[in-house]
Each structure stands twice: as structure tokens, then as C-alpha cells.
Amino acid sequence: MNKIRKGDRVIVRTGKDKGKQGTVLAVLGEHVTVEGVNVAKKHVRPNPMLGTTGGVVDKVMPIHISNVALVDANGKPSRVGIKVENGVKTRVLKTTGAAVGA
């Protein structure tokens, strides 16, 4: 069971975007892409076959999953634990003890 999933609200703990919050767009193995975090400029060549124009495009790049933490209701970073009740695993915030997601 992954501790961080698509749609979770996270905060960046280290790096150039430290302190920024965003929503997880995708989980790619040990990397995640977070909305508005680690944005790079990519040069795109025009492709008349696809009807795309060339230019400089902002692209969200992945960051390592260890550099982000879930945000609790108070806006503080929190670690995630897994609790088993009646054979069902649920993710739980360590700071508040509240269940994460549905």
C-alpha cells in the first residue's frame, strides 16, 4: 500500500521548492509529480502533422517521494502510518491520527 497517492495534498520538505504545497498529479514508482512544484521549461519543436506549435513550455517534473509529506488539517506536514481494522488497511496521519482519503 502506497503511503502517498494521486490526489493527496502534500508539502515539499527539501529542495528549491521547500515549503510549497500542492496536489499529487501522478505517482511514478518512487517519484511523484506535484501541481505547481518543480516546474521546468522545455523547448518544443513544432509538429505540423499534429498541429502543434513550437516554443517554450512549462512542464511539471517529478521529485522523489521522500522529499514530500502529507499535509494534515492544520497545514502541518505529517508522516503516514497504516492501520488494519477488520482486515482492511487504512492510511492514518501520525500527527492527528485521522484517516486519509476514502
UniProtKB/Swiss-Prot annotation:
InterPro entries: KOW, Rib_uL2_dom2, Ribosomal_uL24, Ribosomal_uL24_KOW, Translation_prot_SH3-like_sf. Keywords: Ribonucleoprotein, Ribosomal protein, RNA-binding, rRNA-binding. GO terms for molecular function: rRNA binding; structural constituent of ribosome. GO terms for cellular component: ribonucleoprotein complex; ribosome. SUPFAM superfamilies: Translation proteins SH3-like domain. The keyword Transmembrane does not apply. The keyword rRNA-binding applies. Belongs to the universal ribosomal protein uL24 family. Part of the 50S ribosomal subunit. This is Large ribosomal subunit protein uL24. It comes from Ralstonia nicotianae (strain ATCC BAA-1114 / GMI1000) (Ralstonia solanacearum). The lineage of its organism: Bacteria, Pseudomonadati, Pseudomonadota, Betaproteobacteria, Burkholderiales.
